[in-house]
Amino acid sequence: MPHFLAKLDFKPLKYPLIEGDFCFHKEFLSLKNPTKSCVYASFKDRIFLLQKIRRANDFLIKSEKTTPLKREILKQALRIYSQSFEVISHNLQENSKHASGKKALDLGTFEDFIQKNQAPILAEIGFGSGRHLIELAKNNPTKTCLGIEIHTPSIAQALKQIELLDLKNLHILQGDGRLILESMPNYKCEKIFVHFPVPWNEKKHRRVLSEKFLNEALRVLKPRGFLELRTDDGLYFEDSLKLALKNFQCEIEIKKNAQIPVISKYEARWNKLKKDIYDLRIYSLELNETPFYNHAFDFSFDTITMSEKSVGTILKTKKIIQEGYFVHVCNIYENKGDFLVELSMGDFDWPVRLFVLLTENQIFYLNKSPLKTLNNHKAHLLLQNILSQKGIG
């Protein structure tokens, strides 16, 4: 991660610091940990935060992951900010020409991307090495291919291949496929692939394919579209088949040890060991009449006034856990009556770290709201109550 180390003895900074398209507006001091602060900054119209941590012999200044910038822009921001310090060391050199310039989709703009997309969508959830996903995009140039993955190295590998092969129809999104599917409107996908997911036979609640996931998939699929599960785990296959058969009306296609054009490294290993591989296709037969409410979820805040007393109470509030979701106020930073609230919140399956800015006139999430799912919206309403001091036990 781009960062620099600076000596402790330096003159207090006079904000704002402005150079070119960068502005370092002000510094918020942690009310929980006196050695930490957040620098509130912007590049053009994009807000971002820098973490400033006082250690025994130096300051560590780095980016705050919840407000990401493109790597080279972030390095430039840190180089500019470092001019106000006596730098001990840094890793802010110009980027290697071999690094990939292709970026994953941002969860904050995913809703807009989906709404604007007009081509049929082929989605793969948990694409691993990316072999199947890459071939899917190469063989379907007129369709939008979407790869959803939580594993960062897999994402980096796929992005390099996309750039190398110039696959303009392939997009990558980092996140939990279960929640992303829930946030998508009806009839957006033509096909959904789930190949070799972790079986979680001892913790079945952690599986990708559950009754809720299947219902969401059938809602999102176009008529005659299908969800394809490919697995080497017999129990996972049997449980998934039982889930499919619970539907009043369904069409199912089953194959065992079918030969397919693209074989992943994982599958090649099992083929050598003569291990059985199961395919289960579940077709969407008709228009799903389940209404899609997620687009109506409102993540704005009512007016909230913060005082020293309320801030102290909020900081002492323990993590509040409800069925399927939670809210935890991790820290509060302050600057002349303005507050930055650091949060961990949302759905248990894919919690998010966010910052909320509270000033005299406004309150909002920095850069992005939580993904529009039911549990995230419930967490947002709970957060509203916490910040306004309603219903805190």
Swiss-Prot record:
Write out the entry's keywords from A to Z: Methyltransferase, S-adenosyl-L-methionine, Transferase, tRNA processing
Give binding positions for S-adenosyl-L-methionine: E124, E149, D176
Q: InterPro entries from the entry?
A: SAM-dependent_MTases_sf, tRNA_(Gua-N-7)_MeTrfase_Trmb, tRNA_methyltr_TrmB_bact
Per UniProt, the enzyme's principal EC class comes to: transferase
Q: Does the keyword Transmembrane helix apply?
A: no
Where is it found, in Gene Ontology cellular component terms? tRNA methyltransferase complex
Catalytic activity, EC:
2.1.1.33
Is the keyword Protein transport in the record?
A: no
Which reaction(s) are listed as its catalytic activity?
guanosine(46) in tRNA + S-adenosyl-L-methionine = N(7)-methylguanosine(46) in tRNA + S-adenosyl-L-homocysteine
Record-level Gene Ontology MF annotations: tRNA (guanine(46)-N7)-methyltransferase activity
Residues bound to substrate: D232
Q: Cite the annotated pathway.
A: tRNA modification; N(7)-methylguanine-tRNA biosynthesis
Q: List the disulfide bonds.
A: none
Outline what the protein does: Catalyzes the formation of N(7)-methylguanine at position 46 (m7G46) in tRNA.
Q: Which family does it belong to?
A: Belongs to the class I-like SAM-binding methyltransferase superfamily. TrmB family.
- PANTHER family from the UniProt entry: 3-DEOXY-D-MANNO-OCTULOSONIC-ACID TRANSFERASE/TRNA GUANINE-N 7 - -METHYLTRANSFERASE, PENTACOTRIPEPTIDE-REPEAT REGION OF PRORP DOMAIN-CONTAINING PROTEIN
The protein in question is named tRNA (guanine-N(7)-)-methyltransferase
Name of encoding gene: trmB
